[in-house]
Regions:
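A broad, structure-centric signal for solvent-exposed, well-ordered loop/edge residues
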Residues: 25, 29, 54, 62, ...
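Gly/Ser-rich oxyanion-binding loop with an adjacent helix/lid
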Residues: 62-132
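Helix-rich "cap/lid" substructures immediately adjacent to catalytic or cofactor-binding pockets
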Residues: 2-87, 164
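Ubiquitous "structural anchor" signal
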Residues: 18-20, 96, 100, 174
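Alpha/beta catalytic cores of group-transfer enzymes, especially the acyltransferase/condensing modules
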Residues: 11-13, 38-41, 100-175
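Broad structural signal for hydrophobic residues in well-ordered alpha-helices, predominantly aliphatic
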Residues: 22, 36, 96, 144-145
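Generic anion/oxyanion-binding catalytic loop in active/binding sites
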Residues: 18, 58, 97, 130, ...
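Residue-level preference for short coil/turn positions at secondary-structure junctions
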Residues: 1-2, 82, 126, 158
Length: 175
């Protein structure tokens, strides 16, 4: 068998019911959820039952996605799958670092909770928006951004997908 990489997702991967089957089938995954619940009560139930509108609020999204990311990796590890490499996208980078042992114990989850609260507060104080632009070259998107005072390219995800962010009304006009 070749090398195995665990790739941890970021914000935007949330959905109602995420992680429930891991909780039901894997003691290692269940331990991750229980540890999360000890620091942030209700995290597990939020993953399993919260409507997508609640899960999409940053202060909820990030702890839940992180928890499911880590639970999935622990379940794979428990099943005998060894990661030769770990990587993550945005929030998933923190889960990858935690899984790799960079953060001791439950420190990664605490960090994610503080990060999520800070990001939520910043978003409430400075409302903005983001939009993914598909099927255009980066240079084309960058040129369009220059036509707006408060729209910037922020995430160069992959060829043909660039995320822009800025003032909400200007993002709406951009789209």
């Amino acid at each position: 068998m070749g090398k195995v990489a665990f790739v941890f997702s970021g914000q935007g991967a949330q959905y109602t019911g995420m992680g429930k089957s891991l909780w039901e089938k894997s003691p290692a995954a269940r331990a991750v959820f229980e540890a999360a619940d000890s620091q942030r009560p209700g995290t597990s139930q939020q993953c399993f039952t919260a409507p997508v509108e609640e899960l999409s609020v940053t202060k909820n999204t990030q702890p839940c996605v992180y928890c499911v990311d880590l639970a999935a990796a622990r379940a794979l590890e428990e099943a005998g799958v060894k990661a030769d490499y770990v990587a993550g996208f945005s929030l998933g980078e923190v889960a990858a670092l935690s899984f790799a042992g960079v953060f001791p114990g439950e420190e990664g989850f605490g960090f994610v909770c503080r990060r999520a609260e800070a990001m939520q507060k910043a978003a409430e104080e400075n409302p903005g928006a983001m939009a993914a632009v598909l099927k255009l070259k980066n240079e084309q998107v960058e040129a369009i951004c220059q036509e707006f005072e408060q729209v910037w390219p922020v995430n160069y995800n992959c060829p043909g997908q660039l995320v822009v962010a800025g003032e909400k009304g200007q993002i709406e006009a951009f789209c």
